[in-house]
C-alpha cells in the first residue's frame, strides 16, 4: 500500500540509581542516554520527519542548567540529535568521561530523566518549532515542563476558543502547544498550592522550594488538564524538579507500554522495543491501561494512577494491522490470522484452481499476513489430498500418490520494492512514470495466460500505488487473472486520532461508493446525507451520530470492489482483476482485544470523531462534489 504518515513514537527512561551505579555496573554513566537511543532507533518506523529528546538533572545548584533539549528534522534526525549531544563531550578527557560525578556536575545530558520523541506530522505543519519535546521554562524548577506525545486532538478549536475567551492569547494554533500551555498553567497552580501550604507550616526561602519539590502532585495536574481533550493520545512529560509521567487516553486508542525494575522505569509506544532494548521477556512488559498514568516522583517512587475513568475499549486495530512492528508476539499471530482467514474467499476467486495459482505479497508489511494465507492454503491442500486418496477404491500406488501429492501450494516473491528509488521520486509531470518503477517483478515466475496471481497487501487506502505501479508491473507477466487481497477490511472513514487520512475523497472505497450512487441515479441519497450531516453538526457534540454511514447502505461490498477495479485499472491493462477484502467479522476474530475499528465501520469512540466525520462529508460535498455535479 501507499505509505501512510501516522502516529508518533515516544520513549521515556527514569534512572532509579545514581549515575555512579551505572558507571560501575555497565562501564558508563551514559547507560540511560544509550538506552534512549536504542528505544528511539527501534521505533524509527513510527516517525521519520523529525526527532527530539530532553533530559533533566536531579542534582544541580543555582546558576547551572538542569534541563536540556535537542531537536532535529529529517529522516536522520535521531542520529543528528545524539551526535550533537556527543559533540558536547568532545573536549572532555577520557578520565572526565569515565567520572560519573564529574559528568553529573559538569556535562549536559548527564541526568536521570530522559524523554525522546519521533515525529510524523498529521497536520501538514513543519519546522523545528513543531518538533517535540516542547519546553516551558520558569525560574522555579518545579514549574518547568517538557512535554511530548503521540496524539491528535479532535476538539482543539473548542479549547483554543475557551482560552481566548478567558483573555489568553496563544502564540501557536496546535494541539501540542495548547496542551503545553494548559498543562503548564495547571502545574503553576499545583506549585502555588504547595507554596501556600509551605507558608502555612512556617517554612521560608529554600525550605519552601524543597517542600514544593517534595510534594508537587503531577496526578492533580493531569486530572485538571486531560479531561478537556477529546482524541487519541499518549502524553509524556518531565518537570524541572524531577517528576515524570506518561498518560494514555481513556478510550485506549493509542498504545503505551512500560517496564520497571530496581534500576529503571521506562515507557515506549511498542512492546518489542522494550523487550529488545532491555533483553526482557514479553510478560515483563505491561500495557498502560486506558485513562491511567505511570508517574515517577522525584524520589524515584513509581506508581500507576487512575486519572480518568476508562470510557471505552477502543484500542486501534489498524495499529495491529499496519503500524506496529510485526515482531510483537501477539501482533505476529494476529496478522497471520488475518491472512489465513482469507483462504476461502481467495479459493472462490480462483475457482479452486490451486494447481495454476501463485501466491505472493506486496512488500513489506504484508509479509506476515502472507504466511498466514500460505498456512490456510496448505491446510486446504492437505484436506484435498486426503479426500482424493480416500476416494480411491484400492490402495494407492506410488505413482498415484506422487500425482496427488504433487499438487502443492505455489508461492513466489513476485513483487520487489526498490527502496532507494523512492527517495528520488520528484514532483511534477515525471512523478507518475518514476512511481511506476518503485516496484519490480521476478521474471519467469508466472506462466503467461495460465497462472492466476494472488497478491496480498496489508490494506488498500487510496489505491494510488496499485494504479500507478503494482497493477502495471503485474500485468507485464500476463497472468490469467490478478487477485489483489487486502488483509484489512475496506477503509471507508477518515481517522482523526493521529493517522494522516482525514479526507473522505482520498479513499478509493468512498469514491467508488459515490460513483455507484451516481450510476444508480441516487443523487437524492447523497443530498440527504449532506443535509443530515449539517443538521447533526448543530447538535451538542455528545449527541452526534455518524450520518456518513448512510452512503454505504445502498451499495454492497462486491459492488464497491468491482467499481474500485474499474476506477484503478491502468490504461492498457487487459488482465482480469478481482479485489478481495477482509470482512469486519474476520477482523474481529483475528484481533479480538483491539476493538477500535472506526476506519472500517464509522464507529468513532469519541464525540469529536463523530463530529469531524460529519464535517468531512460536508467539506467533500461543498469543495469536491459540487464542482463535479450540482444537486
Per-segment meaning from a language model:
Residues 1-289, 295-358, 362-363, 372:
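Conserved short alpha-helical segments that host acidic/polar catalytic motifs at enzyme active sites
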Residues 332-429:
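Conserved PRPP/pyrophosphate-binding segment of the phosphoribosyltransferase/PRPP-pathway fold
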Residues 452-469:
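A phosphate-binding catalytic loop at a beta-strand-loop-alpha-helix junction
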Residues 342, 359, 459-460, 482:
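Hydrophobic, well-ordered secondary-structure elements that form the walls
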Residues 94-101, 195-216, 379-408, 520-529, ...:
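Short mixed-charge
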Residues 440-452:
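Short basic/glycine-enriched coil/helix segment immediately N-terminal to the Walker B
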Residues 226, 241-243, 248, 260, ...:
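PRPP-dependent phosphoribosyltransferase catalytic core
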Amino acid at each position: 500500500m501507499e505509505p501512510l504518515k501516522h502516529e508518533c513514537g515516544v520513549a521515556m527512561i527514569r534512572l532509579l540509581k545514581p549515575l555512579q551505579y551505572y558507571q560501575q555496573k555497565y562501564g558508563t554513566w551514559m547507560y540511560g542516554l544509550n538506552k534512549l537511543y536504542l528505544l528511539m532507533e527501534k521505533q524509527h518506523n513510527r516517525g521519520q520527519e523529525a526527532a527530539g529528546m530532553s533530559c533533566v538533572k536531579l542534582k544541580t545548584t543555582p546558576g547551572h542548567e538542569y534541563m536540556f533539549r535537542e531537536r532535529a528534522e529529517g529522516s536522520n534526525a535521531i542520529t543528528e540529535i545524539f551526535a550533537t549531544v556527543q559533540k558536547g563531550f568532545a573536549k572532555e578527557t577520557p578520565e572526565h568521561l569515565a567520572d560519573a560525578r564529574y559528568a553529573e556536575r559538569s556535562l549536559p545530558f548527564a541526568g536521570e530523566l530522559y524523554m525522546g520523541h519521533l515525529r510524523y506530522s498529521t497536520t501538514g505543519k513543519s519546522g523545528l518549532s513543531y518538533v517535540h519535546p516542547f519546553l516551558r521554562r520558569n525560574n522555579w524548577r518545579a514549574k518547568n515542563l517538557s512535554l511530548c506525545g503521540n496524539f491528535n486532538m479532535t476538539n482543539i478549536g473548542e479549547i483554543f476558543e475557551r482560552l481566548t475567551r478567558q483573555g489568553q492569547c496563544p502564540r501557536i494554533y496546535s494541539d501540542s502547544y495548547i496542551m503545553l500551555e494548559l498543562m503548564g498553567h495547571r502545574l503553576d497552580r499545583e506549585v502555588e498550592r504547595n507554596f501556600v501550604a509551605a507558608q502555612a507550616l512556617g517554612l521560608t526561602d529554600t525550605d519552601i522550594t524543597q517542600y514544593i519539590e517534595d510534594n508537587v502532585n503531577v496526578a492533580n495536574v493531569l486530572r485538571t488538564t486531560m479531561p478537556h481533550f477529546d482524541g487519541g493520545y499518549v502524553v509524556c512529560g518531565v518537570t524541572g524538579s524531577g517528576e515524570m509521567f506518561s498518560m494514555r487516553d481513556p478510550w485506549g486508542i493509542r498504545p503505551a507500554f512500560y517496564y520497571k525494575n530496581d534500576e529503571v522505569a521506562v515507557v515506549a509506544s511498542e512492546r518489542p522495543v522494550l523487550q529488545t532494548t532491555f533483553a526482557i521477556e514479553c510478560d515483563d512488559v505491561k500495557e498502560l491501561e486506558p485513562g491511567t498514568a505511570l508517574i515517577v516522583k522525584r524520589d524515584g517512587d513509581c506508581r500507576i494512577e487512575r486519572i480518568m475513568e476508562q470510557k471505552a475499549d477502543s484500542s486501534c486495530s489498524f495499529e495491529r494491522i499496519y503500524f506496529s512492528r510485526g515482531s510483537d508476539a501477539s501482533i505476529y499471530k494476529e496478522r497471520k490470522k488475518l491472512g489465513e482467514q482469507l483462504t476461502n474467499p481467495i479459493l472462490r476467486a480462483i475457482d479452486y484452481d490451486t494447481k495454476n495459482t501463485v501466491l505472493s505479497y506486496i512488500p513489506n508489511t504484508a509479509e506476515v499476513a502472507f504466511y498466514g494465507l500460505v498456512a490456510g492454503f496448505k491446510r486446504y491442500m492437505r484436506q484435498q489430498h486426503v479426500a482424493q486418496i480416500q476416494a480411491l477404491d484400492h490402495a494407492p500406488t506410488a505413482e498415484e500418490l506422487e500425482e496427488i501429492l504433487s499438487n502443492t501450494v505455489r508461492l513466489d516473491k513476485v513483487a520487489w520494492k526498490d527502496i532507494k528509488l523512492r527517495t528520488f521520486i520528484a514532483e511534477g509531470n515525471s512523478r507518475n512514470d518514476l512511481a511506476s518503477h518503485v516496484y519490480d517483478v521476478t521474471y519467469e515466475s508466472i506462466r503467461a495466460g495460465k497462472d492466476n496471481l494472488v497478491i496480498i497487501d496489508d490494506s488498500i487506502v487510496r489505491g494510488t500505488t496499485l494504479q500507478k505501479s503494482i497493477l502495471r508491473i503485474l500485468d507485464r507477466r500476463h497472468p490469467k487473472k490478478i487477485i489483489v487481497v487486502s488483509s484489512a477490511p475496506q477503509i471507508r472513514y477518515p481517522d482523526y486520532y493521529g493517522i494522516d487520512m482525514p479526507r473522505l475523497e482520498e479513499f478509493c472505497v468512498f469514491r467508488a461508493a459515490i460513483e455507484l450512487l451516481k450510476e444508480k441515479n441516487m443523487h437524492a441519497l447523497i443530498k440527504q446525507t449532506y443535509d443530515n450531516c449539517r443538521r447533526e453538526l448543530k447538535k451538542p457534540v455528545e449527541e452526534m451520530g455518524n450520518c456518513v454511514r448512510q452512503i454505504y447502505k445502498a451499495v454492497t461490498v462486491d459492488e464497491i470492489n468491482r467499481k474500485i477495479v474499474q476506477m484503478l485499472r491502468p490504461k492498457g491493462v487487459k488482465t482480469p482483476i478481482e479485489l478481495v477484502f477482509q470482512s469486519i467479522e474476520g477482523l474481529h476474530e483475528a484481533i479480538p482485544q483491539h476493538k477500535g475499528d472506526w476506519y472500517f465501520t464509522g464507529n468513532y469512540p469519541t464525540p469529536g470523531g463523530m463530529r469531524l466525520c460529519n464535517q468531512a462529508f460536508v467539506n467533500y460535498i461543498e469543495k469536491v462534489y459540487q464542482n463535479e455535479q450540482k444537486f
